[in-house]
Regions:
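Signature of N6-adenine DNA methyltransferases within the class I
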Residues: 1-174, 293-295
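Polybasic, glycine- and aromatic-enriched phosphate-binding surface used to engage nucleic acids
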Residues: 134-346
Length: 346
């Protein structure tokens, strides 16, 4: 059976809310169940299957399906089937009481070609032609003309790494004020560190915090029998450290961090920035000794790439305009500066 009209507000259930059995079943049944898919994406696919060729579908969903990687198969499916996205209306971010979901009302026509009408939250209206190959729609929907930025080279191609900082799984243990670190641990077992909050407050990657670190400069974990002063200190926190998922589920050593640090990249001169920011800003960490925490991202320029020119470009109005057009929205007008997106910056 097919339907002339389909209207829905499907459940927003991230992949973490699904059981392993559900994930396996959905991946076998739906083209769009790939990566970190959300349940509403599958509802959209099934609705498209049920839509008559000349029918019309209107769904309320989070706007992020328009640009996140997990929804690329759905965007590609629309293009492959020749389905016309007639209108996208970004309604108030807090339209659902108590939730900030950045909802979007999307109206789809079963068959057709042409431009898409876009209504943004600030009331501006424009029409655009959406990519039909699964690429992000963000820049098109937000009305940004960034064609002059195309250089044939992206940020990902001139950097060794663009990545989030380290997650220890127990910052309350591994992060200390420098003045409060036991003397026996200094300097061999500590590295300067910075959080997103400190970066914004200080305006610099320098802070009074350090990470107590059981890793060598090459990124290998020091063996337990060689821990010395670190081992004596860590024993007093052993119960807390053993209670982490990386130990209980992933089988990591009880004193290891949640993530294994790529020390050879971390301990390089780098550019750092907050993971969520209203107006993106980038700072130089020239000494190459700061290990950013998980709320701070960092990028390491390739050899031969001018550190200062890259830093200046990232803080330039044109680069900021690109981020405004392409980055995922967060609450209160903030942007998420995700490495996957930033690597595509021209």
């Amino acid at each position: 059976d097919s339907f002339d009209f389909i209207v829905g507000n499907p459940p927003y259930v991230p992949i973490e809310g699904l059981s392993e059995e559900e994930k396996a079943r959905y991946k076998a049944e739906f083209e769009t169940a790939s990566g970190r898919f959300d349940l509403y994406i599958l509802f959209l696919e099934r609705a498209l299957d049920l839509l008559a060729p000349d029918g019309r579908l209107t769904f309320v969903t989070p706007e992020k399906w328009e640009y996140v990687k997990a929804a690329a198969p759905l965007r590609k499916l629309l293009g492959a089937r020749g389905i016309q996205v007639e209108e996208i209306n970004h309604i108030e971010e807090d339209a659902f009481t108590g939730l900030v979901t950045f909802p979007s009302v999307t109206t789809i026509q079963g068959e057709g070609q042409g431009k898409t009408k876009v209504v943004l939250r600030d009331g501006t209206v424009h029409t655009t032609t959406l990519p039909d190959n699964g690429q992000s729609w963000a820049a098109k929907i937000r009305g940004a003309d960034l064609s002059e930025m195309e250089t044939g080279v992206t940020l990902g191609e001139v950097t060794t790494r663009v990545s989030a900082g380290m997650a220890t799984g127990a910052d309350s243990v591994f992060v200390e004020k420098r003045s409060e670190v036991p003397p026996s641990l200094k300097p061999d077992w500590v590295h300067p560190t910075v959080s997103g909050r400190q970066l914004g407050k200080n305006g610099s990657p320098r802070s009074d915090s350090v990470l107590i670190c059981p890793y060598r400069a090459n990124g290998t974990l020091v063996e337990e029998q060689e821990l010395g002063a670190f081992g004596e200190w860590a024993q007093s926190h052993r119960a807390r450290l053993e209670d982490r998922s990386c130990v209980k589920k992933a089988g990591k050593k009880w004193y290891a961090w949640h993530e294994t640090p790529p020390m050879q990249d971390l301990l390089q001169p780098k550019i750092v920035f907050k993971d969520i920011e209203k107006e993106p800003r980038f700072w130089a960490e020239r000494k190459g000794d700061v290990i950013p925490r998980h709320s701070v991202y960092y990028l390491v320029p390739d050899q031969g790439v001018s550190f200062d020119e890259l830093l200046e470009y990232l803080n330039s109005p044109i680069a900021q305009e690109w981020m405004e057009a392409n980055c995922q929205r967060a609450a209160n007008g903030f942007l998420r500066l995700q490495s996957r997106v930033l690597r595509q910056l021209p």
